[in-house]
Amino acid sequence: MTWSKIYNIIKFVAKSVYRNFEVIKSVLLIFLIMLSLILTWSLWTLKPNYSNLEETRTLKKAQVTDTKKITDVIRPSQIIYYDKNSYRGMPANDNFIERVNQMLENTKFYESRNRPSTNIDEKLKNKEYIEVIYPTDMTADIYSQIFNLTSSGGTFTIPSADRVIFYKKDTNEVEAHIISYTQRKMITASTTFPFDSLKNIINNAKSGVLEYEPYDVERDTDQGAEVSRRFYFPKQSFELNSYSYLSRSINSDTIDRYKNALFRDPGNVKSGNTGEYYTDESSALDVNRNTNRIKYTNFTQGPDEDMTQQTRSPLFNSVDFINNHAGWGNPYYFYNLDPTSGSVEFLLFVRGIPVIKSDMEMKLGWTNNELNEYQRSLVELVMDDKEYSFKPKKVKLQSAAEVKAALKEYDMSLVNKLAVGYEMTHARGQENVYNLQPKWFVNYGPSHDWQPLFRDSQGPGGEF
């Protein structure tokens, strides 16, 4: 074919297109309209396959079978009844604590008003009272979850408080002081608390009731010395049980359970060279096999960022997060809150007593309502299987006089908390068996480290 023929063909096609341009345009327009209708119909009738996504969601829901409410994870550390002559309480009694919690949930507060916390003892002189002590200071929004404050009809602006004292007036009306010794403030309110019912439980208990002594830490003020903190210790030496428990096996399935729950897209998670470090573009999961502990870090949030946007209590965020990310496992209870850093801590409780071991703590850090860090133990004790239970042994613990003598070796301004707790150790030669030994512990120093109160060779601040 010569170039002249090619030219003639192109010229003919061009002329044909020109002469039929309107027809071609109409046909093309009709085609596009038909294509648009077909695509629209396809979108409306599309039935995508979500089976893989639903499988993942179902798996996560199946893993979280032990969700909890705020009131499920908050429990008093002590309940003391003063009968005008002596102080009494019931340590290590789960049933008693549960009954008190139910009473508190049903208690209404009304006609609340702010007062200074000075001269509390004078105000309670010659009165019976019940003191409910919590393990840490709690803010008003947390108390509003424990108590019925909707009908308070007054102000409830106390910054934080760690105890509530219920007492009967001469009119038999039950009032309450919600007290913060450290803030030197309190709220007084009328209540519907069943004072006599709780008093009768303690008076009628056939066993487990101990007599206590108060121990005050004082500070100097312009008006003289005043109580900055108050502890209660059993007056006489007393006995508690030590226990041994099997733990569930920790294997790849255990790691996968947390990996699937913590990462948004587990399929895109990369593992490190050791296989114990997992990461995606925004977070990481570090598994420590020596301590059987995991640490999840969210790189998009840092603990040093501005906290002004923290609009919700870190405790509420923590409970929601654990509920939605592989659950609780053993019974953990709220034990410490630092609102300034957004840090929340939970301790494992066994038969009413906390396990004091850093490797067993559950800790979450929040910045502006976003999680920045989550640490917890992979160890889960088998606490409900009688077939594999071990016989408990009696252990004698020190009296109030001995505790007070030991505290003379400490700077009381650095003593944060005192508690009876379990020391948790491996049984000799049995990696899956843990021994729990009750002891007195002190939370000491600016780093808030727990250590045994009674030691043979080391002084305050020594290693745990």
Where is each model-derived feature located?
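Preferential activation on post-signal-peptide N-terminal prodomains/segments
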Residues: 2-17, 26, 38-309
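Hydrophobic H-region at the start of alpha-helical membrane spans
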Residues: 25-33
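Short, non-transmembrane alpha-helical segments in secretory-pathway proteins
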Residues: 96-108, 250-259, 303-341, 386-429
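Amphipathic, soluble alpha/beta structural segments
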Residues: 161-182, 347, 354, 402-438
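Exposed beta-strand-loop-beta-strand "reactive/processing" segments of non-cytosolic proteins
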Residues: 253-297, 328-378, 418-451
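Short helix-loop boundary/capping segments
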Residues: 366-396
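C-terminal structured interaction module
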Residues: 444-464
